[in-house]
Amino acid sequence: MKKIFFIVLSIMTVLNAEEWAGRSGGFLRMGISARSIAMGGGFTAELDYSFPQFHNPAWTAFLTNRQLGSSYSNLSFDRRLAATSFATHLPPTAGIGIAWVNAGVTNIQGRYSTGMKSSMMQTGENAIMFTFAQRIFPWLAIGSTVKILRYDLPITESDQLTGSGIGFDIGILMKTKKFFTYGITIQDISSNYQWDTGNVYAEGRIYKENFPTIYRVGTRFNRKELTLVGDIGVIT
C-alpha cells in the first residue's frame, strides 16, 4: 500500500511540475549558474557568486567585493539562455545590482499563407533587473528587485507581437553569529506580460499573462569546508 501511495504521489508531483513549467516567465526559473543548478536551485540563503541578486536580492547588502557574471546556455530545440549581472556594495550598509536575462528560440522557418518559405525568425524574452538592498542590522538585510519584462513574438515577416510588463522580487536574509544563514524570498510579484493583438488580428484584444509567484524559505549551514543548503518553495 505504501509503495502504491509513493508512486501516485510521484506521478502527481511530476504532472504538477510540468504544468508550472509551461507558465509565463519560465526562463527566469531555469537557473543561471552551473553551481546553483547543480545544487537544485536552493539558494535562498546561499550566495550565488557572480549572480548574487537572482535568488535573494538581500544578498547584495552583504557583498564585500564587486560581483560580475555572464553565462550562455545553448539548449536543445534551438533554444538559448543568456544572462549578465553586476552587483556591488554601497557603503556603508547597502548594495545595488543590475542584471539582464535573455532567452528565446532561433531558426524558426517562416512561411507565407501559400505555404512557401519566407525568412528565418526568432523569439526573444528579456528581463532587466534593478536591485537595491539595505542592512537594517549587521545580521539582517532586506532587498528588492524591479524587473522590466518584454517578450517579442514574430507572426510574419512584417507583423510582430510584443508583450511587456513589470514585476518585483523581495528578500530577507539573516546571518547568525555561528554557522547558519536564513533567507526568505517572494519572486515575481505582479510579474506579467500584457499583450495587444488588435493590430494583428481583426478581433484582437488586450490581455495579461501572469507569472506564477514563488514563495521560498531557505537555510544554509557553512563550517570550514562543509556547506549544506536547503529550500522549501511554494508556487501559486
Language-model regions, residue ranges each:
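Positively charged n-region of N-terminal signal peptides that target proteins for export
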Residues: 1-4, 138
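N-terminal periplasmic accessory domains that precede
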Residues: 51-62
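Outer-membrane beta-barrel porins/channels
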Residues: 18-46, 65-68, 73, 80-236
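Sec-dependent N-terminal signal peptides
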Residues: 4-13
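N-terminal processing/targeting junctions
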Residues: 12-15, 34, 60-63
